[in-house]
């Protein structure tokens, strides 16, 4: 009996430590950006400044204006959220985590019209950047990144 009690305590403590382990909370930033070559009208936001060089190389534009954004802290990896601006909105539905990336269902709307619906993987190591439609003399750019 004396041997069984320590063994039972050891088994239960291992079971609780394994079962009670949870994923660390992480915040995802989502941004709707208008990229243009017009003169700057306002300073570039900090989130955009982090990847401004990449955006310039990818799209060839020199100015980036943040028109909508959202931050969501992921606790289970299966949350959803909305980043919106006056005319565009991005609905993000996180479907869980696989191999150091979040699996996302993305829907981009212009007012009520669905423009894009896709599945994507958001790596924890690098941002997800999507070229959107032409807007005036610029381009809509969608950025999601784990902070």
Predicted regions: what is each one?
Residues 6-17:
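Bacterial N-terminal signal peptides
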Residues 21-147:
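Outer membrane pore-forming secretion/assembly proteins and partners of Gram-negative envelopes
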């Amino acid at each position: 009996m004396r041997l069984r009690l320590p063994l039972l305590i050891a088994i239960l403590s291992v079971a609780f430590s394994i079962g009670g382990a949870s994923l660390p909370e992480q915040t995802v930033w989502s941004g709707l950006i208008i990229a243009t070559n017009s003169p700057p009208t306002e300073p570039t936001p900090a989130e955009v400044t982090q990847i401004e060089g990449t955006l310039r190389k990818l799209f060839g534009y020199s100015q980036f204006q943040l028109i909508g954004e959202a931050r969501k802290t992921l606790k289970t990896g299966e949350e959803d959220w909305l980043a919106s601006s006056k005319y565009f909105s991005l609905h993000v539905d996180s479907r869980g985590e696989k191999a150091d990336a979040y699996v996302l269902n993305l829907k981009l709307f212009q007012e009520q019209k669905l423009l894009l619906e896709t599945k994507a993987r958001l790596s924890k190591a690098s941002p997800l950047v999507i070229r959107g439609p032409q807007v005036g003399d610029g381009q809509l750019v969608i950025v999601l990144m784990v902070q």
